[in-house]
């Protein structure tokens, strides 16, 4: 009986000690775990022989919606959900709709990230390694190599964690009836 009481006392002590430190997750891991929506301005740099730089706004919402609005140097809108990707290029009067074969939407990437010793977060999906860096408790930089082995770095600014975002913005609605819709 005494052995049982000693074990019980140890278990109670451990539960009290754990209650004082309920979270073993870092601030960044907490953000990733509870992230339901994200909004930010972005700068995307494609490092190749001649670097390309794009600017725009990202809005994303769980479980797997994202809208990338490229503003410079060319206008482009990319709508993503769990089934397809729509790339709308207003200058070409064209929208291309492609089935999403691999789960590489924004939230799938974020949910699979694991903290590294250097403080960054990494995951590999379909032979592509993604690396996320936080700054001031918010996602700051996302890096990966594209299919041509070019390094892509997306830097976020004016980031908002869990803003209210209407579902309707993730649905592509042609703004011009004269656009070509290409299904791949």
From Swiss-Prot:
Key words, A-Z: Chaperone, Periplasm, Protein transport, Signal, Transport
From the record, what ranges are coiled-coil? none
Instruction: Identify its protein family.
Output: Belongs to the LolA family.
Q: Which Pfam families match?
A: LolA
Q: Where in the cell is it found?
A: Periplasm
Q: Does the keyword Oxidoreductase apply?
A: no
Assembly, in brief, is: Monomer.
One GO cellular-component annotation of the UniProt record comes to: periplasmic space
**Record-level GO BP terms:** lipoprotein transport
Q: By what name is this protein known?
A: Outer-membrane lipoprotein carrier protein
- Say what the protein does: Participates in the translocation of lipoproteins from the inner membrane to the outer membrane. Only forms a complex with a lipoprotein if the residue after the N-terminal Cys is not an aspartate (The Asp acts as a targeting signal to indicate that the lipoprotein should stay in the inner membrane).
């Amino acid at each position: 009986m005494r052995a049982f009481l000693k074990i019980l006392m140890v278990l109670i002590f451990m539960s009290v000690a754990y209650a004082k430190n309920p979270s073993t997750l870092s601030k960044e891991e907490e953000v990733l775990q509870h992230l339901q929506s994200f909004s930010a301005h972005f700068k995307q740099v494609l490092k190749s022989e001649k670097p390309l730089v794009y600017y725009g706004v990202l809005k994303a919402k769980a479980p797997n919606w994202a809208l990338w609005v490229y503003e410079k140097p060319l206008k482009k809108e990319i709508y993503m959900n769990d089934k397809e990707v729509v790339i709308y290029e207003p200058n070409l009067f064209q929208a291309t709709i492609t089935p999403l074969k691999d789960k590489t939407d924004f939230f799938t990437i974020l949910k699979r990230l694991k903290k590294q010793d250097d403080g960054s977060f990494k995951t590999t999906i379909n032979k592509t390694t993604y690396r996320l860096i936080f700054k001031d408790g918010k996602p700051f930089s996302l890096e990966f190599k594209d299919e041509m082995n070019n390094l892509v770095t997306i830097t976020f600014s004016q980031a908002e964690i869990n803003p209210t975002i209407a579902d309707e913005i993730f649905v592509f609605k042609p703004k011009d009836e004269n656009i070509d819709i290409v299904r791949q």
